[in-house]
Every structure is written in structure tokens, then in C-alpha cells.
């Protein structure tokens, strides 16, 4: 096999406000829990069923951590892109435990807030961690733009925009 891919994309709702802590170096680390749900109709009873999965997300990317700390609140709908990582730890009795988390590393990952701000519809925006071509200027553009400074059109389509906001120009 030539290579492998470890990429996770989640769209869900925050189960609580972000938990922020600091490393000894002063860098922020943010923990969030995201709920994703799927629903279906039971073939036998015709009853609607729903299953919710809870995902632990850890943000090491300083720019994304600042955005999470300032703007994320319980119940908000978010888009998160990161890597799956499993870590081993020991509980108080010395038994080995394992935790699997979605991790946004220092120079990788993406966070977008999908709920409107103060009654606005559509996508609020987000932040992509990455190389030097991506800035840490969250909040300096309009409500329907996400931060993907690598070039091209903004990511995400948003919703609730009017037809006059649409750009008819082809992005390539």
C-alpha cells in the first residue's frame, strides 16, 4: 500500500461549553464533546428511532483553540476536521485504559461554526490550521466565509443567504 489516511470529519452539536486548560508552556488545549445523531424507521414497528454518538475532540492548534475559547457554546452546531488518535492511560487502580479522540494538531485541523450568530442564518465561519499561508484573523470577514487561506473559494456553502450574496464567478 502506497500510503494511508487518518482523517475524521464530524458535523454535530456541542454537548457542553469548551474546557480550556494550559500546558506548562502556556499554550491552550481545548476539549469539546460533539454529539452526532442518526435516525431511521424501524421496519417492524414503523417507529422512528435515533442513535446518538458522543465524540471527544482535543484541540492543540493555538489559533483554533482561541476561536473555540471565545465563540463556542453548548448546543452550537460545528464542523470539525481532525485525526483519530487512541491513547493509553492508567486509572487509580493501575488498570490500563484506552481513550480514542479526534485531535486537531498544531498545524492541522479545521473548525467551523455552522449556527448563525445573533439570529443570522447560515454559516458563521471557521478556522483552518495550517501553514504560513493561513492567518489567525478569525472574525474579520463576513458571516458566510470560512477561513481556508490556501487559495480558491471559501469552504462551505452556508445556508440562509439571499441570491444577491451568491458569486457567479467560477473559482478556477
From Swiss-Prot:
GO terms for biological process: DNA recombination; DNA repair; DNA replication. It comes from the Bacteria. Keywords: DNA damage, DNA recombination, DNA repair, DNA replication, DNA-binding. GO terms for molecular function: single-stranded DNA binding. Coiled coil: none annotated. One of its GO terms (cellular component) is nucleoid. NCBIfam families: PRK06341.1, ssb. Plays an important role in DNA replication, recombination and repair. Binds to ssDNA and to an array of partner proteins to recruit them to their sites of action during DNA metabolism. This is Single-stranded DNA-binding protein.
Amino acid at each position: 500500500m502506497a500510503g494511508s489516511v487518518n482523517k475524521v470529519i464530524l458535523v454535530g452539536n456541542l454537548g457542553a461549553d469548551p474546557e480550556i486548560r494550559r500546558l506548562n508552556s502556556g499554550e491552550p488545549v481545548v476539549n469539546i464533546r460533539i454529539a452526532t445523531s442518526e435516525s431511521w424507521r424501524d421496519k417492524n414497528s414503523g417507529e422512528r428511532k435515533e442513535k446518538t454518538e458522543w465524540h471527544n475532540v482535543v484541540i492543540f492548534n493555538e489559533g483554533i483553540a482561541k476561536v473555540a475559547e471565545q465563540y463556542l457554546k453548548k448546543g452550537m452546531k460545528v464542523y470539525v476536521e481532525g485525526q483519530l488518535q487512541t491513547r493509553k492511560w492508567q486509572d487509580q487502580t493501575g488498570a490500563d485504559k484506552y481513550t480514542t479522540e479526534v485531535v486537531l494538531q498544531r498545524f492541522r485541523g479545521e473548525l467551523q461554526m455552522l449556527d448563525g450568530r445573533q439570529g443570522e442564518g447560515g454559516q458563521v465561519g471557521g478556522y483552518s490550521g495550517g501553514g504560513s499561508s493561513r492567518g489567525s484573523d478569525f472574525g474579520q470577514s463576513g458571516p458566510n466565509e470560512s477561513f481556508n487561506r490556501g487559495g480558491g473559494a471559501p469552504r462551505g456553502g452556508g445556508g440562509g443567504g439571499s441570491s444577491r450574496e451568491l458569486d457567479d464567478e467560477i473559482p478556477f
